[in-house]
UniProtKB/Swiss-Prot annotation:
Its cofactor is Mg(2+). It holds the Pfam family Pantoate_transf. This is 3-methyl-2-oxobutanoate hydroxymethyltransferase. GO terms for biological process: coenzyme A biosynthetic process; pantothenate biosynthetic process.
């Protein structure tokens, strides 16, 4: 598989081929993904909750992102690697935004993702001008859950729908190469997808986007809580628990280690 670029994402929209992404936060996951036909990897700030046990994404730092991005990059996946810009790494000033986006790019990100719509126009434009591709993120934006009164579906009110459409068009005009649409109504996501020329990637926004993304822990059944919009393709949590219980039993019963697992001088 050849290295995936942002041009491949744009071509897929033109050809009406689905773009498929997953999150990854470590070397083993990225190595496995590298052996699949997945299009893109998001090193997401969701790592704060699913890997580091934090309450929300607000507590994820640039240091956290760089450590996990480094681990993914070392697996050398051919997929497009997109890195999330964590909370307060791009909101305080355009200068900080470009500097932090550049830091992620230097550590191997092919693109960066940031949350927000119309209000992020100048930030997106500046990062793109610096030569770094930007993926937008609208709808439910977890870094702003306090402002919207918690984690809720957006787009029910006409005003919210109009703002989402405006946000998408503004991000496209600012130079974003694609947009994640999270937790909105499927008909709203469809309208957005049909109104812009760059790809839309859905998570909890229905089947009409140009692509889909899931948190890998949800897909594998490793999460404490699986949101309604995610599908658990395997119960890896249960398999791991059973493997650990088998290990405990075999050690107690003297079955492990077996002769094949150690060296004896008299053998």
């Amino acid at each position: 598989m050849e290295k995936v670029t942002i041009r491949d994402f744009l071509k897929k929209k033109e050809k009406k081929e689905k773009i498929i992404m997953l999150t990854a936060y470590d070397y083993p996951s990225a190595k496995i993904i590298s052996q699949t036909n997945l299009d893109g990897i998001l090193v997401g700030d969701s790592l704060g909750m699913v890997v580091l046990g934090k309450e929300n994404t607000l507590k994820v730092t640039m240091r956290d992102m760089l450590i996990h991005l480094d681990a993914v990059v070392k697996a050398k996946p051919p997929q497009l690697i997109v890195a999330d810009m964590p909370f307060l790494s791009y909101e305080t000033s355009i200068k900080d935004a470009v500097k932090n986006a550049g830091l992620l790019a230097r550590h191997g990100a092919d693109a960066v993702k940031l949350e927000g719509g119309e209000e992020m126009r100048d930030v997106v434009r500046a990062i793109v001008r610096a030569g770094i591709p930007v993926m937008g993120h609208i709808g439910l934006t977890p870094q702003r859950f306090l402002r919207i009164g918690g984690y809720r579906i957006l787009g029910k009110r006409e005003k919210e729908e109009e703002q989402l459409l405006k946000d998408a068009k503004t991000l496209e005009e600012a130079g974003a190469f694609s947009i994640v649409i999270e937790n909105t109504y499927s008909d709203v996501a469809k309208k957005i997808t049909e109104s812009i020329s760059i790809p839309t990637i859905c998570i909890g926004a229905g089947p009409y986007c140009d692509g889909q993304i899931l948190v890998i822990h949800d897909l594998l059944g490793l999460s404490d809580f699986t949101p309604y919009f995610a599908k658990k393709y395997i119960d890896l949590r249960g398999l791991i628990r059973r493997a650990i219980e088998d290990y405990i039993s075999e050690v107690k019963e003297g079955k492990f280690p077996g002769k094949e697992h150690y060296k004896s001088r008299d053998s």
